[in-house]
């Protein structure tokens, strides 16, 4: 049976896990690391994902994409080497890398996954994540909120009743969820967050500070230099991480730029106090959603049993201090903030496949859902923090006499006016019999599934005519678009496979040239010179092929040389066998003499007796 993997598709890093022997286990990637940078690049037509993509970002910033998760569910496009890609396609490339690493670990094909998203992701962003999975060749069995997944991993072995606050500050998003845990029962009471707040923003304030200080000193604006920007970004991220463990760090970027007077170097000390001053507003921004979640759950900080920190950015001391001050509790540090979400996704995968028993998960919708009504008012049908799956219906009517159609404008958010909320989509219900306004009965029904994805239905109760819509992401990807992207992804995977095969054949050919030269030196005088000349000619043919880029030429030349070397090896083996046989015959002729010697020894011993 095919295994189901759990994936934390993160803004800056991603992680994949699977259930092994009843326990969730993180799968290391091909590079041996437990997390994979969510970075995609193209270089000379080759697609690079993960650690290798991150390493080359400084020299190839225009064709490298970072933090694509921040654009999920939008119409944003990335142009890489002249080709345009949607956020779903870029995310699918990351998912394909995680899928391949999981398949290498498990030794079998993987076609199904549970993928996590920020709790505060809206419907478009959730649908976009499912689309990315489909493009990557994965059936997404469930979309799980990241804080909920973290609580699943944390609460697996806990039997006592607990009320926990999950504080999840990742690379690009922030979520806070309040859950009640009770021996396998996980119920989300409230969730809140900010999809535009994360570790990237902490990096940016350091970056902006470095740019400002450098401009003061040298009069050069580094924000206009793409390559310098990438170096600054990496240095800012490293400084941020360093300051979680030390009080001061040195940022050194030699040859960051140059002017008429020569090269310029950036050398600066950054203290933790200065970093906290620069990022104070960001830390304070995490407190708003935290207060809101507690308020929605009807709880006070003193009623919390535990605070769980999730996401790499929760390692920042000021963040830990802020949540400790607000809740009055020392945050729990018994989980790895980089891995716990993927582990929770694997647990949910286990629940869906039946490998994990006695776990019940009740999640909530993060934002209110409704429609636009007369005057541009947002009329809510489902309030935020409603347990999902759920459905709700309400009857509306026409706004004008003899109105024969109505447009249903579906929205998600908390503002009073429709225009201030997130538009999820529009659809029309037509052929309504003409009647005075207020007479037709239009029933609008919302269904939210366990993934948090919305289906809307409008029905004319008079005629029974019905219209449905499944909300799709704002990227506007149709089924045909997704199918085309799936095929493109498959072709890319095949191209990657061929490219890998070509590299391997080239390496094998190079190695064969080296071993041939070594072998021919060793066999001089032992085989005919004609055979040595033939091998040398074949070796030179391989070397010439390696100078070019014709894969078939390299492969053919390599195979020819390999066959010649094999024939030489067989002859050497036969010669060695004949020589051994000749030596063996001589030894047999001496055996009787050896027996006589032994007998003589025994005779001497007997004489002494």
UniProtKB/Swiss-Prot annotation:
Keywords: ATP-binding, Chaperone, Nucleotide-binding, Phosphoprotein, Stress response. Coiled coil: none annotated. InterPro entries: ATPase_NBD (IPR043129), Chaperone_DnaK (IPR012725), Heat_shock_70_CS (IPR018181), HSP70_C_sf (IPR029048), HSP70_peptide-bd_sf (IPR029047), Hsp_70_fam (IPR013126). It holds the Pfam family HSP70. Residues 580-609 are annotated as: Disordered. Induction: By stress conditions e.g. heat shock. Residues 598-609 have a biased composition (Acidic residues). It comes from the Bacteria. GO terms for molecular function: ATP binding; ATP-dependent protein folding chaperone; unfolded protein binding. The modification Phosphothreonine is found at residue 173. Belongs to the heat shock protein 70 family. Acts as a chaperone. NCBIfam families: PRK00290.1 (NF001413), prok_dnaK (TIGR02350). This is Chaperone protein DnaK. The lineage of its organism: Bacteria, Bacillati, Bacillota, Bacilli, Bacillales.
């Amino acid at each position: 049976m095919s295994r189901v993997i759990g994936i934390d598709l993160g803004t800056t890093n991603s992680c994949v896990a699977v259930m092994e022997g009843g326990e969730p286990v993180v799968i290391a990637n091909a590079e041996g690391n437990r997390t994979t940078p969510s970075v995609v690049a193209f270089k000379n037509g080759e697609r690079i994902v993960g650690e290798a993509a991150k390493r080359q970002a400084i020299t190839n910033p225009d064709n490298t994409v970072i933090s694509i998760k921040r654009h999920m569910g939008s119409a944003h496009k990335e142009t890489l080497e002249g080709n345009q890609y949607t956020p779903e396609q870029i995310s699918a490339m990351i998912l394909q890398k995680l899928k391949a690493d999981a398949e290498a670990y498990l030794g079998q094909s993987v076609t199904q996954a549970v993928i996590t998203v920020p709790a505060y992701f809206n419907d478009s962003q959730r649908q976009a994540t499912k689309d990315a999975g489909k493009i990557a060749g994965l059936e997404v069995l469930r979309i799980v909120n990241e804080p909920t997944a973290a609580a699943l991993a944390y609460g697996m072995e806990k039997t006592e009743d607990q009320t926990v606050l999950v504080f999840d500050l990742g690379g690009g998003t922030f979520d806070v969820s309040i859950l009640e845990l009770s021996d396998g029962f996980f119920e989300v009471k409230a969730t809140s967050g900010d999809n535009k707040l994360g570790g990237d923003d902490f990096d940016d304030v350091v970056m902006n500070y470095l740019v400002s200080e450098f401009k003061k000193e040298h009069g050069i604006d580094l924000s206009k230099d793409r390559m310098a920007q990438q170096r600054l970004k990496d240095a800012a991220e490293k400084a941020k991480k360093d300051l979680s463990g030390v009080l001061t760090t040195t940022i050194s970027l030699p040859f960051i730029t140059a002017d008429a007077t020569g090269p310029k170097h950036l050398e600066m000390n950054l203290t933790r106090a200065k970093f906290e001053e620069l990022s104070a507003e960001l830390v304070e921004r995490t407190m708003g959603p935290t207060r809101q979640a507690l308020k929605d759950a009807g709880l006070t900080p003193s009623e919390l049993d535990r605070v769980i920190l999730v996401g790499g950015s929760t390692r920042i001391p000021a963040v830990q201090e802020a949540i400790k001050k607000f809740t009055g509790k020392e945050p729990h540090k018994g989980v790895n903030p980089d891995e716990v979400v993927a582990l929770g996704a694997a647990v949910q995968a286990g629940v869906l496949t039946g490998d994990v028993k006695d776990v019940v998960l009740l999640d909530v919708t993060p934002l209110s859902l409704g429609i636009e009504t007369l005057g541009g008012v947002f009329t809510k049908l489902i309030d935020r923090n409603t347990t999902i799956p759920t459905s709700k219906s309400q009857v509306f009517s026409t706004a004008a006499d003899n109105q024969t159609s109505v447009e249903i404008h579906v929205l998600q958010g908390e503002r009073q006016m429709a225009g201030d909320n997130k538009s999820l989509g529009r659809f029309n219900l037509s052929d309504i019999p003409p009647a005075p306004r207020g007479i037709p009965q239009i029933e609008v029904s919302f269904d939210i599934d366990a993934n948090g994805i919305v289906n809307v239905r409008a029905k004319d109760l008079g005629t029974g005519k019905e219209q449905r819509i499944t909300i799709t992401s704002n990227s506007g990807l149709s089924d045909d678009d997704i199918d085309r992207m799936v095929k493109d992804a498959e072709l890319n995977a095949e191209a990657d496979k061929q490219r890998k095969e070509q590299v391997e054949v080239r390496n094998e050919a190079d190695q064969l040239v080296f071993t041939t030269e070594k072998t021919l030196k060793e066999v001089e005088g032992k085989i005919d010179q004609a055979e040595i000349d033939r091998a040398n000619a074949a070796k030179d043919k391989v070397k010439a092929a390696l100078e070019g880029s014709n894969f078939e030429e390299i492969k053919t030349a390599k195979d020819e040389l390999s066959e010649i070397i094999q024939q030489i090896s067989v002859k050497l083996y036969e010669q060695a066998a004949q020589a051994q046989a000749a030596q063996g015959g001589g030894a047999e002729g001496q055996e009787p003499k050896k027996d006589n010697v032994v007998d003589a020894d025994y005779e001497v011993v007997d004489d002494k007796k």
